[in-house]
């Protein structure tokens, strides 16, 4: 807790810790630089437990994926979550935790329930984001905290603006959508033969179908067109942060950035996800 004096008035300010999970794309190294904490998400590879960016690197993960390993995700254990909060509360007065969307994982709802045991000192924000939009929420929270806003004020802003974001996604192969049960083997086979590429959208809680086109070039154009429409119509007159996320290689996101230069867009970041 610290005090600031303005116009003779003493303002008491709580020390606020910002925390998120590794679904934000923020690495442990970057978290250290930002002065925040990132909860590593657990996953199983051939029934062996790993923690993202702790016991397995991204490069190793994609190598195992290419080897057709059996991979499944899980949520952090309540004990791990509470232990990290308790550690932070030894140094800070309050914690703002920004996990992935409750519509995509039960880990958010679990965290909300666990926070009730901390007498209002832990604030869990279900602002229904993941990846680059979740990352942006974290960056916004850091900026608001550094401006002197209270934890309640920061949470109010994040919740009020939670739906003011979109993610557009495409994939170069249908293999993993089939393997994860999101499409049937028959649909995957037909899509592969016809070179169909799905464009998906995360707008709020869940992952939904947005479009279906032929070829990865058309898929990327569809995403850029959708973003341009959002900027001109949905977010007209507002400052918009853009980010390109990628897997395995940065080449794809770099090409998307080059394709958007004619639109005079300025990209804020391009983390892997």
Residue positions per predicted region:
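Long, low-complexity, intrinsically disordered polar/charged segments
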Residues: 12-18, 89-91
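N-terminal glycine-rich anion-binding loop in soluble enzyme alpha/beta folds
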Residues: 17-75
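Enriched - but not universal
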Residues: 4-6, 88, 268
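Mixed-charge interfacial surface used for oligomerization/domain docking
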Residues: 10, 23-37, 42, 94, ...
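Class I S-adenosyl-L-methionine
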Residues: 49-117, 122
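A generic local structural motif
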Residues: 4-6, 23-25, 82-83
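Short, Lys/Arg-enriched N-terminal segments with co-localized hydrophobic residues
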Residues: 1-12
